[in-house]
Structures are given as structure tokens and as C-alpha cells.
């Protein structure tokens, strides 16, 4: 039983790790590249030269640079969030692999660690799509919109556009997150190979019989 259960969880963690790593490292790369690129654009366009005319010199239009500055800060927060709260399914299989399993006691200890890692993976996936994550992202994007409109004295429509753009990126991040560990944990708790302690009750076996004798008959159902 221990071997079968351990094989199930090990296979599940290893199978889910490649896509989890792609999602986690991919979004770190996207957020990092966005933060750096927008930061450079904000710095280079902040003091753009104004065309000199005989009329009074107009105020430089910094709306593009301001948008890039706000976007850079938002993306930097995205990188920080992914680093502070790592995506456990991306590394769980690697953490389990070095543990020995040569004796029954070692296999039992490894199984306990495997179950713990699988539950951590499922919990992290649920948190990543949970209400708290949605509210935190909405708060950051709302703050970015307020800064655009209030701090930079821009129209509120510009603030709404900033909020909507940031929220679209946040939702793409949330709903592209893998959820395999959550499904694997449900399968394991519902009755994986050798997991007799968590298996679902077997359907009761029904038997029927029909008896005939002179003057009558009988029907018997056993369950």
C-alpha cells in the first residue's frame, strides 16, 4: 500500500512540475521584462524636448512617461509577489526526489512528506485563484489608476484605462495558473492505488434468487 500510494503522488508531482515551472518562471520573466522596459521608457521620455516657438513654451506632455512609470511599478510588484509566495508545484517534485525509500520506515516517512507536499501544492493553487488574490490585484490596479488620475492630474478616464489594463493582465495571470495538484489530491483522497484509508466505499453487492415449489413461488433479494 505504501509503495502504491507513494508511486501515485510521486508521479503526480513529477507530471505537474513542467507546466508549473513554465507558468511561474514565465510570469516572472514577463513581469521583469515589462518592469525594466517600461522603466527605461519612462526615464527616456520624461524630459522630451519641446519644440521652441514664438508663443509661450507649453508644458511638456508626460502622459506616456507617466503611464510607463506606473506600469513599471505595477509589474515590479508582480515580480515581488511571485518571489515572496513561490508556486509550490514548480519545485515539489524536486524536493521529494532526494528522500530515500530503501526500507519500509524510509518509504513511510517519504509518503508522509509526499502527502504534505501534494496538499501544499493544492493549497497554493487554490490561493492563487482565490478571492484574496483577486482583491489584492484589484487593489494594486486601483491604486495605479488613482495615481494616474490624482497624482499626475490626469482625467479620470485615464485612471480607469490604467486600472482596466492592469486588471486584464492580472486575470490572465490568475486563470492561466495550473490546477493539476488540486485534481490529483482529489483523486488521491477519493481512492488512489493502495490508498485504502481514503478510498470510497464499495457499492454493495446485490443478489437475488427465485424459488418455486408446488403451489407457490418465492423471490429473495439480498444486499
Regions from the PLM with identified roles:
Residues 16-69:
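N-terminal Sec/ER secretory leader and immediately downstream segment
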Residues 59-73, 155-165:
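Hydrophobic alpha-helical transmembrane segments
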Residues 28-37, 70-75, 135-143:
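Mid-membrane cores of alpha-helical transmembrane segments in multi-pass membrane proteins
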Residues 42-47, 65-89:
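Glycine- and aromatic-enriched membrane insertion/assembly motifs of diderm outer-membrane
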Amino acid at each position: 500500500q505504501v509503495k502504491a500510494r507513494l508511486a501515485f503522488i510521486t508521479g503526480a508531482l513529477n507530471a505537474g512540475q513542467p507546466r508549473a515551472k513554465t507558468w511561474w518562471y514565465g510570469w516572472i520573466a514577463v513581469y521583469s521584462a515589462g518592469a525594466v522596459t517600461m522603466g527605461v521608457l519612462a526615464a527616456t521620455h520624461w524630459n522630451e524636448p519641446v519644440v521652441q516657438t514664438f508663443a509661450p513654451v507649453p508644458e511638456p506632455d508626460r502622459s506616456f512617461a507617466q503611464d510607463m512609470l506606473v506600469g513599471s511599478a505595477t509589474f515590479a510588484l508582480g515580480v515581488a509577489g511571485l518571489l515572496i509566495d513561490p508556486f509550490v508545484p514548480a519545485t515539489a517534485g524536486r524536493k521529494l526526489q532526494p528522500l530515500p525509500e530503501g526500507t519500509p520506515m524510509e518509504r513511510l516517512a517519504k509518503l508522509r512528506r509526499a502527502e504534505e507536499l501534494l496538499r501544499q501544492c493544492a493549497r497554493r493553487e487554490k490561493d492563487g485563484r482565490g478571492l484574496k488574490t483577486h482583491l489584492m490585484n484589484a487593489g494594486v490596479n486601483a491604486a495605479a489608476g488613482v495615481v494616474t488620475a490624482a497624482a499626475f492630474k490626469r482625467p479620470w478616464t485615464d485612471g480607469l484605462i490604467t486600472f482596466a489594463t492592469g486588471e486584464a493582465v492580472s486575470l490572465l495571470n490568475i486563470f492561466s495558473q495550473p490546477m493539476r495538484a488540486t485534481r490529483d489530491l482529489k483523486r488521491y483522497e477519493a481512492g488512489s492505488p493502495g490508498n485504502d484509508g481514503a478510498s470510497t466505499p464499495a457499492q454493495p453487492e446485490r443478489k437475488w434468487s427465485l424459488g418455486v415449489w408446488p403451489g407457490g413461488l418465492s423471490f429473495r433479494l439480498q444486499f
